[in-house]
Amino acid sequence: MHPLKNLNIWGDGGFIATNNKKIADKLYLLRNHGLVSRNNSKIFGYNSRLDTIQAVVANYKLKNKLDGVTKKRIKNSKLFDKLFKTNPNVKTVKRFPHLKEVFHLYHINVNKRDQLQQYLISKSVDAKVHYPIPIHLQTAAKYLKYKKGDFPVAEKLARTSLSIPVHEFVKEKDIKYVVKLIDKFY
């Protein structure tokens, strides 16, 4: 429930839902330093407790906001899909009809990504590059001994992917404006 995610609260937080008692019991321990009593930890865990006010906000948003946010993001992403169909320079994410896809970010894959981003920003569009370094080239993955060229698809996506606003506050006219700008750029 990071402030920038689809369902957010007034800070960082989260929840896990499961119908598996074994998993639930383990997670319950992990969220509170593995404590089984005030002074005894069964396992090493984390401080992952949500404070009361955050929990109240999260509970309210789950009950009253999630469906609306989800529907709006799906609607926005489908409009982008439809409008980009006529631009051969823009590749969108493949959709799977049997899945309910709710976009946190709407990625397009384009040549001249960085130039397009600067152009969109100059026109007040919040275009961002997310994930510019593929996982296998991250410092944390160095021990795996992968090198540039080992995952060419991931590397191409890292070079060409651009995120454009798809959140629930984006209006239809805003989406059409963004698409028009991108069409004009190419």
Label the predicted regions.
Residues M1-W10, S37-K42:
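Conserved active-site segment immediately N-terminal to the catalytic lysine
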